A protein has these predicted regions:
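Conserved ABC ATPase signature
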Residues: 130-134, 372-379
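Conserved ABC ATPase "signature" region
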Residues: 99, 103, 108-126, 339, ...
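Hydrophobic anchor residue at the start of the ABC signature
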Residues: 144, 386
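Catalytic Walker B motif of ABC-type/P-loop ATPase nucleotide-binding domains
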Residues: 155-158, 397-400
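Conserved ABC transporter NBD signature motif
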Residues: 59-67, 75, 299-307, 314-315
Length: 403
């Protein structure tokens, strides 16, 4: 087989929106082939066509030598697919999720354990924990294990590292490179330029069209004005000598487990202060205490001059908070989410109306104003979650792994 994937003239429209326009490319066996492009470029639609979940309007595609329309059952047997939102059953345990996916393909965990062993062993200590309670990095590893459990010939990964910490992101790509050495073909969509370099070849897709296919370095060179634009600038922070946050010996325990252990630090007004650490290090727990959402079990701290233990309601009025899971209401429209959160922060209807279109235009979401949030790509949800966190112009903004 010269090519394990062959795509010729594939087009797909949703109403008046053309998601893919005459897409053509081929993937060699054993290759890591990358798709890079902005949100809404057509990456997810292309993956759904290749994994036989959506029919193309025009063109032809083959995976593992099989036509995606005529031989979809055989392709589903030979392909593994990890969608952008991790298709896990949140109320099932880690072990139950893996067993379920193995059963779908008429196999067992034991039969193919050797293939997923290195990945699954990292989350096996939590095998009885519900998937919905896992960190982003753990969900990622479980989703990859589920996609591999039937021993596929090719793996489709739709932005698999979005929303996880840098340590987990690196670990994930190390796992993919090891799978490549074992002969697995991998097609991965990624929004991160540094991940491009792990691919053998890259296809740059924009507005539903393949703009170019080449090695990562050549794609970066060819499209440098788009992928690495010049002329970006930022305002120098106006850091003052006063402290916006002061923490001393802050501790949080859940039963016998210590999530945050006597941390102390200070953040000046106007400063950008970062937490760096792996999943489970305590970053989210620390942020939730600082935002007045969780009571500390020891130590003390102030945010915007208010005590986080006794004046947490005042703290909430001075801050903006963007949680790791983007606390948006999926069944509300974009503008309805903004209105809801702005109202919670005490803004008047007049203020909200005057500001909504301006903010959406700045974020490039004005045309999506009346779109249900559940229909938005992950990157657009990210923009919306950020906008509702800063809409009321807080003094301090907390961002929990926003990218």
């Amino acid at each position: 087989m010269d090519y394990i994937v062959s795509v010729k003239g594939v087009s797909k429209s949703y109403g008046e929106v053309q998601a893919l326009k005459d897409v053509c490319f081929e993937v060699k066996p054993g290759e890591i082939f990358g798709l890079i492009g902005p949100d809404g470029a057509g990456k997810t639609t292309l993956f759904r066509i290749l994994t036989t979940l959506v029919l193309a309007d025009e063109g032809k595609a083959e995976v593992c030598g099989q036509d995606v329309v005529k031989n979809y059952k055989e392709i589903r047997r030979q392909a593994g697919y990890m969608p952008g939102r991790f298709s896990l059953y949140q109320d099932l345990s880690v072990e139950e999720n893996l067993t379920f996916f193995a059963t779908l393909f008429n196999t067992t965990i034991r039969e193919n354990y050797a293939l997923v062993k290195d990945i699954y062993q990292q989350i096996e200590p939590f095998k009885h924990r519900r998937a919905g309670k896992l960190s982003g990095g753990m969900k990622q590893k479980l989703a990859l294990s589920c996609a591999l459990i039937h021993r596929p010939s090719i793996l489709f990964l739709d932005e698999p590292t979005t929303g996880v910490d840098p340590v987990s992101r690196k670990e994930f790509w190390d796992m993919l490179l090891k799978l490549k050495q074992e002969g697995l073909t991998i097609i991965a969509a990624t929004p991160y330029l540094n991940e491009m370099k792990c691919c053998d070849r890259i296809a740059f897709i924009r507005e539903g069209k393949i703009q170019g296919i080449d090695t990562p370095d050549r794609i970066l060179q060819q499209f440098s004005s788009i992928l690495s634009p010049e002329g970006l600038s930022f305002n120098e922070p106006q850091v003052t000598g006063r402290y916006a946050i002061e923490v001393e010996g802050l501790t949080k325990q859940f039963g016998n487990f210590t999530a945050v252990d006597h941390i102390s630090f200070k953040v000046k007004q106007g400063e950008i202060f970062g937490f760096l650490g792996a999943n489970g290090a305590g970053k989210t727990t620390a942020m939730r205490m600082l935002c007045g959402l969780s009571q500390p079990t020891g130590g003390k701290g102030t945010v915007a001059g208010f005590d986080i233990a006794t004046q947490y309601e005042q703290v909430k009025k001075k801050i903006g908070y963007m949680s790791q899971k983007f606390s948006l209401y999926e069944d509300l429209k974009v503008w309805e989410n903004i209105r809801l959160y702005a109202g919670i922060y005490g803004m008047s209807d007049k203020e909200i109306a005057e500001k909504t279109n301006k903010v959406l235009e700045q974020l490039g979401l004005l045309n999506e104003k009346n779109t249900l949030v559940r229909s938005l790509p992950l990157g657009w949800k990210q923009k919306l979650a950020f906008s509702v966190a800063i809409f009321h112009e807080p003094k301090i903004v907390f961002l929990d792994e926003p990218t």
